[in-house]
Design a protein with these regions (language model features):
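A short, solvent-exposed loop/turn motif at the edges and junctions
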Residues: 54-85
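Structural motif
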Residues: 2-3, 7-20
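Surface-exposed coil/turn segments at beta-strand junctions on protein surfaces, enriched
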Residues: 1, 37-39, 63-67, 90-92
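Short, acidic Ser/Thr/Gly-rich low-complexity loop/linker segments typical of extracellular
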Residues: 31-58, 348
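Intrinsic-disorder/low-complexity, polar/charged segments enriched in Ser/Thr/Lys/Arg/Asp/Glu/Gln
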Residues: 3-5, 43, 96
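Short, ordered, surface-exposed loop/turn motifs in non-cytosolic proteins
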Residues: 14-33, 37-40, 332
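Conserved, single-site charged/polar hotspot
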Residues: 21-23, 37, 47-49, 73-406
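Clustered cysteine/histidine zinc-coordinating segments, centered on FYVE zinc fingers that bind PI3P
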Residues: 2-3, 27, 47-49, 57-58, ...
């Protein structure tokens, strides 16, 4: 039987507060398969689980669901027991399930949520075109001065006019990983995955740039429904190939010709409609050796290009250059102090004794451990993606401890 893998990360409220020694139980059909405790960084070891063959995720018309599902239950002292149903496991892929526990509420015995099916497998309402939506609303969107990557976006978990649906504040990068994991299959060629991620990012940034919903009086950035936007799954499973690709290109987006705004890059599972990316079609192009930009141009036109957006948000340290062992600079000194600070919440990261600004072997080991904990490629070299994550985690911990920002 095919095998897939699962890593569970357990936090108390935020990523700044990992939970050590939480009990994680994996079950299927109410039968326990494995129970394991989290380590000092709130993480389980990689768990091997049975699943279906990856060929089912490579054929559009297959009648067998291309992944297996399991339930994950977590208990920890002083926190509400939590259960995520329908955690998805693909053949040869590592799934990442982040679980956020809350303080015990005497009115809630257990917090239960479900990972809904991937949009390529489940049944979801068709998208309403923006032209038709504009006709209905009769309102033109605003535009911002520049294209930026926000720290967070607000996701409305329902249709725009459903006032009972909750709003969730989600880190931008986490949102993109969630949508991509909900919309495509992680077993596909990496260039196909990147092309779809670029479409997802561009669509999202267009919603931000045009203030699509806020200009109409709504208090959110985007919805979770495929009727209007793209699928966001609360507590959804994230897949390692998708996570790694997002970390690599999260600040990239598509533009057409000399137009400044991000392309509102529409896509469907299978379509020949002009101006839409076909998800299954992009998989076929990836199989043929097309790279991400070639796939993008195949669907959106040869005058499309990829641009980088600036980051905005409460990040106290900007990226300047790649850092590696042997470097000696103020940036290295800052890096060493950031790592030691993060270690206050993640004690599995080795301490760097007497930070001096010299990128020594101790610094390399600390960087490798940090990268491993947060799902980055463990090279020991600090690139843009690692620096962004360092700054993000530093800020989250600082907020939790009220060290910076009110």
């Amino acid at each position: 039987m095919a095998k897939g893998y699962l890593i569970v990360n357990v936090y108390s409220d935020t990523i700044a507060n990992p939970v050590e020694n939480a009990t994680v139980t994996i079950s299927k059909n109410d039968k326990e398969i494995v129970a394991i405790n989290t380590n000092e960084d709130g993480q389980t070891e990689k768990i091997t689980l049975d699943t279906v063959d990856k060929s089912y995720s490579e054929e559009e018309q297959h009648e067998t669901r291309p992944y297996e599902t399991y339930d994950v239950s977590v208990t920890a002292l002083g926190l509400t027991p939590t259960k995520i149903e329908g955690v998805q496991i693909f053949d040869e892929i590592t799934s990442i399930q982040n679980i956020y526990l809350t303080s015990i509420d005497e009115n809630q015995l257990e917090d239960i949520s479900e990972v809904t099916p991937n949009t390529l497998w489940g049944e979801y309402p068709p998208n309403i075109s923006e032209v038709e939506e504009e006709k209905e609303e009769g309102i033109a969107p605003f535009v911002l001065r520049e294209v930026v990557i926000p720290a967070n976006i607000i996701v409305h978990d329902g249709t725009p006019n459903n006032l009972d649906a909750p709003n969730y504040t989600v880190p931008f990068v986490d949102y993109i990983k969630n949508v991509a994991s909900s919309e495509i299959y992680s077993t596909w060629p990496i260039e196909t995955i990147k092309a779809n991620i670029l479409a997802i990012i561009s669509f999202t940034l267009n919603r931000i740039y045009t203030e699509w919903y806020r200009s109409k009086g709504y208090n959110f950035t985007i919805t979770s429904t495929t009727s209007y936007d793209q699928r966001y799954t609360r507590n959804g499973t994230i897949f390692e190939p998708i996570s790694n690709a997002v970390d690599e290109i999260f600040n990239n987006y598509i533009r057409v010709g000399i137009r400044l705004e991000p392309l509102p890059a529409h896509y469907k599972s299978s379509t020949t409609e002009d101006g839409y990316l076909s998800q299954w079609g992009s998989k076929d192009l990836g199989d043929k050796g097309y790279n991400a930009l070639e796939i993008i141009r195949y669907y959106y036109g040869n005058n499309t290009n990829i641009y980088e957006a600036e980051l905005t948000g409460p990040y106290p340290y900007s990226f300047t250059t790649i850092l590696r062992q042997g470097d000696c600079s103020q940036d290295v000194y800052t890096l060493q102090n950031i790592l030691n600070y993060i270690r206050s919440s993640y004690p599995g990261i080795p301490v760097i004794e007497n930070p001096s600004g010299l990128f020594n072997s101790d610094t390399t080991e600390a960087v490798k451990k940090f990268q491993s904990v947060f799902g980055l490629t463990s090279t020991g070299t600090v690139n843009y993606q690692t620096w962004y994550m360092l700054s993000y985690i530093f800020t989250a911990i600082a907020k939790m401890t009220n060290s910076i920002y009110s």
